[in-house]
Amino acid sequence: MMLSAEQAQGLAMFLIHGVETEAPITKKILAAVPNDQHGYVLGEKGRTAKDLMWHTIQSDIWFAEGIAAGAFAASESKGDAPATSEEMTAAYEKGMAEGMAKVKAMTGAQLAKPINFYNIMELPAVTYLQFLSNHSIHHRGQLSSYLRAMNAHVPSIYGGSADEPM
């Protein structure tokens, strides 16, 4: 897939808006995980709620940083997860703001430049914003299922929930 600089900038405007619309919803789900439930696991193969939260946070920031850098670094943990949901939510908010500011500063040519994704695919940088969004939504959905199963407050996402009806 090839994009001109102008096409990449137009697509970026659309996709950045999507990421910035979804991020506050993800933040709301992260904040809803009770601190005393961080060890909760849904099923034998599930991650702990805390591990799932930290993976979501780090991955979203990793995508934004990789897009801005024009290359995806080897995925490695950036330290231990913060102790509380509040601290994790703050880390998400800060990291996403910084990463997306870098993406917004990219030129059309930078947005159009292909990035190799582990020799699986090579797409224009801007298209990975959709991967960021999809990945975040996927794990946010998992976390909302954890919240319901642990009998915690489930925030509204696109419409009302039993705990936050419209």
Predicted features along the sequence, with ranges:
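Helix-adjacent hinge/juxtasegments
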Residues: 65-106
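Hydrophobic packing residues in well-ordered alpha-helices of helical domains and bundles
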Residues: 15, 19, 85-92, 96, ...
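Amphipathic, well-packed alpha-helical segments that form the structural scaffold of globular domains
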Residues: 27, 31-34, 100, 104
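Short, low-complexity N-terminal intrinsically disordered segments enriched in polar/charged residues
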Residues: 2-13
